[in-house]
């Protein structure tokens, strides 16, 4: 069950006439510092400070192989390709992402339920959690396009109706992330400022934005100010490594013009105490395979 935005205060205005920077109104780490869990106190402090937490090996090499095979099966299945949950690369016409992968695949559903994964999300968010979004991402070599700078929360707030910043994402590498093959970049500390973007949200904006971000894109001036203040960190790591990052981190990735493909599993956990209401700055909700309306906790 959802409510309308008339009952919820909009703490983070966006998609108006001008770009507006708003100081973060929410904690980063919602759980108690001494609560038991797989994340150490030092790592929780680093997450609070930087907005992200890198783990050298979250899953084993054998597990990486299992998930690689499942990714290959899904991305070569004609039925999956024809499904609206699959997003196709504009140039190559190859599958770029498959959404709601934890519902399509029992292999990835088990990963979501793994305590190494969901246990960290519960500890950070201080509550039970549900999956707001899941997907596999494939960035083939020789020209796969990147994704421009953005805050995920800006979109999830504006178009999905998440009221507060009580959401955490994990990107688990299924291939090696080099410093050359279009890896994830984050501005450390940027999660402490919400950059509300200028411009109204078109109807069915999601159809375009999943291939190339437009609405919800920060200005050059806003990005320059943030990058000058916070810097930019590029994430590299072996297959099986993972990056946890706060929903409001300013992040993006470049094109992959190398021969080396890059693929990952991306899971977004939201607190059951922060369930979606009506969109704060969009005419309609996005489809449920992008922004979940099933708030059943992961068990």
Curated annotation (Swiss-Prot):
Region called Disordered, residue ranges: 1-40
The keyword Transmembrane helix is annotated on this UniProt entry: no
Pfam families from the UniProt entry: PhyH
Record-linked SUPFAM superfamilies: Clavaminate synthase-like
Residues given in the record as Fe cation binding sites: 150, 152, 251
Thermal dependence of function as given in the entry: Optimum temperature is 32 degrees Celsius.
Reaction(s) this enzyme catalyzes, per UniProt: L-ectoine + 2-oxoglutarate + O2 = 5-hydroxyectoine + succinate + CO2
pH effect summary: Optimum pH is 7.5.
Quaternary structure and partners: Homodimer.
Task of the protein: Involved in the biosynthesis of 5-hydroxyectoine, called compatible solute, which helps organisms to survive extreme osmotic stress by acting as a highly soluble organic osmolyte. Catalyzes the 2-oxoglutarate-dependent selective hydroxylation of L-ectoine to yield (4S,5S)-5-hydroxyectoine.
Name of the protein this chain belongs to: Ectoine dioxygenase
Species per Swiss-Prot/TrEMBL record: Streptomyces coelicolor (strain ATCC BAA-471 / A3(2) / M145)
């Amino acid at each position: 069950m959802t409510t309308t935005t008339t009952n919820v205060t909009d703490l983070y205005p966006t998609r108006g006439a001008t770009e507006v920077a708003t100081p973060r109104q929410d904690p980063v780490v919602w759980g108690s510092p001494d609560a038991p869990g797989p994340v150490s106190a030092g790592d929780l402090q680093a997450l609070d400070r930087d907005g992200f937490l890198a783990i050298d090996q979250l899953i084993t090499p054998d597990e990486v192989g299992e998930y690689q095979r499942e990714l290959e099966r899904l991305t070569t299945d004609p039925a999956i390709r024809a499904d609206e949950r699959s997003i196709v690369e504009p140039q190559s016409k190859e599958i770029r992402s498959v959404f709601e992968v934890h519902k399509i695949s029992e292999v990835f559903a088990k990963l979501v339920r793994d305590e190494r994964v969901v246990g960290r999300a519960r500890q950070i968010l201080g509550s039970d959690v549900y999956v707001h979004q899941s997907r596999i991402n494939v960035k083939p070599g020789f020209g796969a396009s990147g994704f421009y700078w953005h805050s995920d929360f800006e979109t999830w707030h504006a178009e999905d109706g998440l009221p507060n910043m009580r959401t955490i994402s994990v990107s688990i590498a299924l291939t090696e992330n080099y410093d050359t093959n279009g890896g994830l970049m984050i501005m450390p500390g940027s999660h402490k400022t919400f950059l509300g973007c200028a411009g109204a949200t078109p109807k069915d904006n999601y159809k375009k934005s999943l291939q190339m971000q437009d609405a919800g894109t920060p200005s050059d001036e806003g990005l320059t100010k943030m990058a000058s203040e916070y810097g930019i960190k590029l994430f590299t790591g072996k297959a099986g490594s993972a990056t946890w990052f706060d929903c409001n981190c300013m992040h993006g990735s470049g094109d992959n013009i190398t021969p080396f493909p890059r693929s990952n599993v991306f899971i977004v956990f939201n607190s059951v105490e922060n369930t979606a209401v009506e969109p704060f700055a969009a005419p309609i909700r996005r489809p449920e395979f992008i922004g979940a309306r099933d708030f059943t906790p992961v068990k």
